[in-house]
Design a protein with these regions (language model features):
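RNase III-family endoribonuclease catalytic core
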Residues: 1-167
Length: 167
């Protein structure tokens, strides 16, 4: 258990010896309406963005949420630094619920496509192909290819240690 706590602190947060937590990341920038529309237009989707907050929430890692930071502060008896100028404020929620929904939708679309595209193939073949298509690394490369990587909102430590924007 103690190892897990140490690992979490190392991955998500800079906790200074003085008991100050600094999750703020100057690399974070919120997705704006024009960027969303330009990405969609690039792929032939012409849609007016009515709920920008939904697109922004889809980019927020748990390490940059108010609830997560509050939990760390309470658990480790630390305080948080004030939000430095130019840094995105801590967010109310992360992408996790949207990811759950998106994974289900993506899997349904892929399964339907494969089922119709390969009518004579076995379930094993279809399952294997689905697994290779619905893959974290493939989806991360796709996100980077379309330019979403620069809009991932995460703690500074996570960004520094895992080079998350590069992966």
């Amino acid at each position: 258990m103690a190892v897990d706590v140490i690992a979490e602190r190392a991955v998500y947060h800079d906790i200074e010896a003085s008991g100050i937590l600094n999750p703020f990341n100057k690399n974070n920038k919120l997705l704006d309406k024009n960027k969303v529309q330009n990405i969609l237009k690039k792929y032939g989707i012409f849609k007016n963005i009515n709920n920008l907050e939904l697109y922004q929430e889809a980019m927020i890692h748990e390490s940059y949420t108010k609830a997560h930071i509050s939990e760390i502060c309470l658990r480790d008896n630390v305080t948080i630094v004030e939000n430095p100028d130019g840094c995105v404020l801590l967010q109310n929620s992360s992408y996790e619920r949207l990811e759950f929904l998106g994974d289900a939708i993506l899997e349904t679309i892929i399964v339907s496509y494969l089922f119709n595209r390969f009518p004579d193939q076995s379930e094993g073949f279809l399952a294997s192909l689905k697994v290779s298509l619905v893959n974290r690394n493939i989806l991360a490369r796709l996100a980077k290819h379309i330019g979403l990587d620069e809009f991932i909102i995460m703690s500074k430590t996570l960004d520094d240690l895992q080079h998350a924007r590069q992966d």
